[in-house]
């Protein structure tokens, strides 16, 4: 009950910044339309709409860190968390309270991307539903990674870390903009170790209906989501003990 009340409070805080939400939802659409237009003039297999849309959807999830990190950082720098520490809520309760309001935003973001791609020629099938649901582990990873940053850094710092570093990591290491095999070497090896490439491959496999391939990419993404959540809880617990 307390956790649900806290989650509702976090949802209200997120809705107080509609410009940030609009940017998170709108910027992936701008990229989708621009790259789709580029594909019509200079055909590139990587930018075909059925291949591009799953990748853009996953890239858009990186903006979830821009929602979760500043929210926690602001609470940490204010007196709010000091009051929260005096309640019976545990660290997992608090992390869930921050996490749960952002999951519907992630689902809406993915749904909007796929809906916007339909007039551009996206193949419409029930597999879109699986693709939308399949991005949830990566959404959890991005949200809890933002919470981890918010637990350790100030409001000004998380803007640079989450707004620049993490979004660029997602862009360059996911294979959305270029085929990682063309670069090869250490760069490709690093990309395959991190979750961004696997999240895009998972989304593409689900959209294509290849559930066997999807399962191979689901494991590393889920593992990273679990580790990020555990790290966020551990850091939040450390902050509670300091207070």
Regions found by a protein language model. Give the residues of each.
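Short cytosolic juxtamembrane segments of multi-pass membrane proteins
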Residues: 236-243
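Residue-level recognition of membrane-helix boundary sites in multi-pass small-molecule transporters
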Residues: 19-20, 93, 158, 189
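Alpha-helical transmembrane segments and their short interhelical loops
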Residues: 91, 95-168, 210-222, 226-230
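Hydrophobic alpha-helical transmembrane segments of multi-pass membrane transport proteins
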Residues: 30-31, 48-119, 165
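Transmembrane alpha-helix boundary and packing residues in multipass membrane permease domains
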Residues: 32, 36-37, 114, 118, ...
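A short amphipathic helical element positioned immediately N-terminal to and/or at the very start
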Residues: 3-15, 203
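Hydrophobic alpha-helical transmembrane segments of multi-pass membrane transport/permease proteins
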Residues: 13-41, 49-69, 103-108, 168-171, ...
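Membrane-interfacial helix-loop-helix junctions in multi-pass membrane proteins
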Residues: 41-42, 46, 123, 174-228
């Amino acid at each position: 009950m307390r956790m649900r009340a806290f989650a509702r409070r976090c949802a209200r805080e997120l809705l107080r910044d509609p410009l940030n939400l609009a940017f998170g939802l709108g910027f992936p659409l701008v990229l989708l339309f621009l790259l789709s237009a580029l594909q019509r003039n200079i055909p590139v297999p990587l930018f075909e709409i059925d291949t591009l849309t799953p990748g853009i959807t996953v890239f858009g999830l990186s903006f979830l860190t821009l929602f979760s990190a500043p929210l926690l950082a602001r609470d940490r720098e204010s007196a709010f968390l000091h009051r929260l520490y005096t309640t019976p809520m545990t660290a997992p309760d608090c992390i869930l309270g921050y996490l749960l309001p952002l999951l519907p935003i992630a689902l809406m973001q993915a749904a909007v991307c796929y809906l916007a791609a339909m007039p551009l020629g996206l193949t419409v099938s029930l597999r879109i539903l699986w693709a939308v649901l399949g991005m949830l582990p990566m959404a959890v990873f991005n949200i809890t990674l933002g919470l981890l940053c918010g637990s350790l850094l100030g409001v000004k710092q998380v803007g640079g870390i989450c707004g620049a570093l993490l979004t660029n990591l997602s862009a360059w290491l996911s294979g959305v903009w270029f085929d990682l095999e063309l670069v090869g070497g250490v760069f490709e090896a690093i990309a395959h170790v991190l979750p961004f490439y696997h999240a895009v491959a998972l989304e593409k496999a689900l959209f294509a209906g290849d559930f066997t391939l999807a399962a191979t990419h689901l494991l590393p993404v889920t593992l990273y989501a679990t580790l990020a959540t555990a790290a966020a809880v551990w850091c939040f617990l450390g902050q509670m003990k300091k207070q």
